[in-house]
Regions:
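Well-ordered beta-strand positions
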Residues: 121, 161, 165-167, 173, ...
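Terminal low-complexity tails and localization/encapsulation signals of metabolic enzymes
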Residues: 2, 248-262
Length: 262
């Protein structure tokens, strides 16, 4: 049986690729393996950025394998436990303090959008992408935090339109409403995502971790709480070797050499 996720390492970038082409369903084995990898990556200092993609160029993911729902309940003990696994994995991606870059191409539906919504960067294909939370079509609702994250990402207006109409949108439309950061030709998409991840690893890891905490936590905090959190990040950051090196390099008009201490 093939691995549900292909893992590659390029310097400080870990590349995870869903391995169930052409549909790249998010099977039970996929979610169990993703759970393992997420917590492993969080504790691996040598990984400073992650790319989440999929094999082939047909589809990122059509989402959960619905035929495995009953098996999943049996495996996890209850429907609630099965749901909590998904919610906890996506939340761990979101809060681990390392940037994740997701590639969206072909079908990106249900869980195939909800997992990328937990990532910090989303890049889409210019053509052929169909992105959405179409659970209404089968009498369901987004179950992995998708409705909340989509609303935070694109606003109530667009979230209502997409979810209540089970609407699938293109890459350029996703860019227009703020769901993705960039669009690229499908043949370039994965390379661009990996290049972006390498770019992020050149930044000071401690500063990235602090800012991701401020930004992600800011979705749930008041402005006053967020400002206090930012203040704490500033105090923590200014005592780091990377902060001192960055300031010294600026004054000396040279490129900084960060040691990536977090």
């Amino acid at each position: 049986m093939s691995e549900p996720i292909i893992v590659r390492q390029e310097a400080a970038v870990t590349i995870l690729s869903i391995n169930d082409a052409p549909y790249n369903r998010m099977s039970l084995d996929f979610m169990d393996r993703l759970e393992e990898l997420v917590y492993e990556i969080a504790e691996t200092a040598s990984t400073r950025a992650v790319v989440l993609t999929a094999e082939g160029e047909d589809n990122f993911s059509v989402g959960m394998n619905l035929k495995q729902f009953a098996e999943g309940i049996e495996r996890k003990g209850s429907a609630d436990a099965l749901l909590d696994q998904r919610l906890n994995v996506i939340r761990a991606i979101e809060t681990m303090g390392k940037p994740w870059v997701a590639t969206l191409f072909g079908y990106c539906l249900g869980g195939g959008l909800e997992v990328p919504l937990g990532c910090h960067f989303r890049l889409a294909a210019i053509t052929d992408a169909q992105i959405g939370l179409p659970e209404m079509d089968i009498g369901g609702v987004p179950a992995w935090g998708g409705s909340a994250r989509l609303t935070k990402c694109v606003g109530e207006h667009h979230a209502i339109d997409m979810i209540l109409r089970a609407k699938k949108i293109s890459g350029p439309e996703a860019l227009r409403i703020g769901l993705v950061h960039e669009v690229h030709p499908i043949e370039e998409l994965k390379a661009v995502a990996i290049r972006l991840a390498h770019e992020l690893t050149a930044m000071p890891a401690g500063s990235i971790r602090s800012m991701l905490q401020v930004i992600v936590d800011g979705r749930e905090k008041s402005l006053a709480e967020l400002i206090q959190l930012e203040r704490e990040a500033v105090i923590e950051n200014r005592g780091t070797a990377d902060s001192r090196e960055g300031m010294l390099a600026f004054l000396e008009k040279r490129k900084p050499t960060f040691n990536q201490q977090s």
